[in-house]
Amino acid sequence: MMIKQAEFITSAVSITDLPKDDFDHFLILGRSNVGKSSLINAITNRKKLARVSQTPGKTITLNLYLLNQSLYLVDAPGYGYAKRSKTQTLTFMRMINEYIQLNGHLKKIILLVDFNIGPTQDDLDMYIELQAFDVDIIVVTTKYDKVKSSHRLKQEKVIRSKFFEGQKIYFTSSETKFGIDKLINEEFSNE
């Protein structure tokens, strides 16, 4: 699938704020600063569609981007940000749970993991928690280019060992676009 059109539509804090149409949603989850906005920009081939911040915890709403007038990429706030208060963390978790449980258009959850660091305990906890929902989960690693090529195969094996057998995992780099076309063609092509 070729992404010909991409635009920011809205920010939502509740299920009632979502657009009232029938387009499929693809939720992008991951730790703060894992590269969610950069991945959206790489998928859409637009450098500044999603604002990229060097400061963790900037995204506090669900940000919806409409692709090809047919599906939404939904950028969620990052989890695991230490400077968020417990109240903010609970509000975030409630918003995500409500979105997953009540959004009848959620097609897939894309869980981002930093390839260089590997899955953190927060990533693994989120992965286990997501198993309770009847939604396809895709693991996408980011920052593949940050690891020396001689160490990549070993890191791929380490990452695969942390998830359930048969889990679909994509290795990507927003910087070099490595793996982006494969992700688009395999996960968004039928949309």
Swiss-Prot record:
Residues 22-191 form the EngB-type G domain. Keywords: Cell cycle, Cell division, GTP-binding, Magnesium, Metal-binding, Nucleotide-binding, Septation. GTP binds at residues 30-37, 57-61, 75-78, 142-145, 172-174. It comes from the Bacteria. GO terms for biological process: division septum assembly. Mg(2+) binds at residues 37, 59. GO terms for molecular function: GTP binding; metal ion binding. The keyword Electron transport does not apply. Its cofactor is Mg(2+). Pfam families: MMR_HSR1. GO terms for cellular component: cytosol. InterPro entries: G_ENGB_dom, GTP-bd, GTP-bd_ribosome_bio_YsxC, P-loop_NTPase. SUPFAM superfamilies: P-loop containing nucleoside triphosphate hydrolases (SSF52540). CDD domains: YihA_EngB (cd01876). Belongs to the TRAFAC class TrmE-Era-EngA-EngB-Septin-like GTPase superfamily. EngB GTPase family. HAMAP family: GTPase_EngB (MF_00321). Necessary for normal cell division and for the maintenance of normal septation. This is Probable GTP-binding protein EngB.
